[in-house]
């Protein structure tokens, strides 16, 4: 199973002081040596972390394929088409959100998404759609001309954190998930089942399947063991771990956990 390392959070740290350090470009050889298969970046409309200068240099200098997350805004699609990353992953975007909150509305935004895909593919860029694990949405994805879907694991990750970490006892507790352990365990089983079923259906529909969002060293094993998922994109937890262990070791450890889980299924 492939690991895409999202390096946005290196730029988040830089932007906290609005200077040029740390530079995300310096992560590229370290991430590669540690065993990652892909670099992932998100060029947001508000440029809150990765900016156009970063994106251009990362795509130019990365010897690993670059997966560029972006919205379906026509101006952004034009920029991505010019930059020519290996892949573009289309994601929903709201300016006020802290991080991407849900999957693309592929059914409601079908025409706009199809237009974006057509433009990107004309520039020889593979396209993935970041979606909730929903069968109807996957059926629509298969018709858009996309090559891949990335299943949104955020709901699974949130339930897992409320069940197996101290999140519920902190200021970041998720109010909608302040439930009994039994209820959380039931919800977790459903979330895992939804992801497994979505991965199976997407693969049968001829789509490649990735997954990501909220994955960390504790919760990644279950997802990495799913047979139809071929790639995981993980960022914040790796960059957070790198503060303590260094970036090389943080990436290496994540890759090791993923590989071990993959051998178990």
Swiss-Prot record:
The active site is at residues 42, 69, 213. Pfam families: PdxJ. Keywords: Cytoplasm, Pyridoxine biosynthesis, Transferase. 1-deoxy-D-xylulose 5-phosphate binds at residues 8-9, 44, 49, 99. GO terms for biological process: pyridoxine biosynthetic process. It comes from the Bacteria. Its EC number is 2.6.99.2. Belongs to the PNP synthase family. It is found in: Cytoplasm. 3-amino-2-oxopropyl phosphate binds at residues 6, 17, 214, 235-236. GO terms for molecular function: pyridoxine 5'-phosphate synthase activity. It comes from Nitratiruptor sp. (strain SB155-2). Coiled coil: none annotated. It is an enzyme of class 2 (transferase). PANTHER family: PYRIDOXINE 5'-PHOSPHATE SYNTHASE. This is Pyridoxine 5'-phosphate synthase. Catalyzes the complicated ring closure reaction between the two acyclic compounds 1-deoxy-D-xylulose-5-phosphate (DXP) and 3-amino-2-oxopropyl phosphate (1-amino-acetone-3-phosphate or AAP) to form pyridoxine 5'-phosphate (PNP) and inorganic phosphate.
């Amino acid at each position: 199973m492939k690991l895409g390392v999202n390096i946005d959070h290196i730029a988040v740290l830089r932007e906290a002081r609005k200077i040029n350090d740390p530079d995300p470009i310096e992560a590229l050889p370290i991430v590669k040596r540690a065993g990652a298969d892909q670099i992932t970046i998100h060029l947001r409309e508000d440029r809150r972390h990765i900016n156009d200068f970063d994106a251009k240099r990362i795509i130019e200098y990365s010897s690993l394929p670059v997966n560029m997350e972006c919205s379906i805004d026509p101006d952004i699609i034009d920029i991505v088409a010019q930059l020519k990353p290996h892949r573009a992953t289309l994601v929903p975007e709201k300016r006020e959100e802290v991080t991407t909150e849900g999957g693309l509305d592929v059914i409601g935004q079908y025409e706009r998404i199809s237009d974006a895909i057509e433009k990107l593919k004309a520039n020889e860029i593979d396209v993935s759609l970041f979606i909730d694990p929903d069968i109807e949405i996957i059926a629509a994805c298969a018709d858009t001309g996309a090559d891949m879907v990335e299943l949104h694991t955020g709901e699974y990750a949130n339930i897992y954190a409320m069940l197996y970490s101290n999140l519920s006892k902190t200021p970041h507790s998720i109010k909608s998930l302040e439930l009994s352990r039994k209820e959380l365990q039931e919800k977790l089983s459903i979330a895992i089942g939804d992801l497994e079923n979505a991965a199976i259906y997407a693969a049968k529909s001829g789509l490649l399947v990735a997954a990501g969002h909220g994955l960390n060293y504790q919760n990644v094993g279950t997802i990495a063991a799913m047979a139809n998922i071929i790639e995981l994109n993980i960022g914040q937890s790796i960059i957070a771990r790198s503060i303590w262990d260094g970036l090389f070791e943080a990436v290496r450890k994540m890759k090791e956990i993923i590989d071990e889980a993959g051998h178990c299924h």
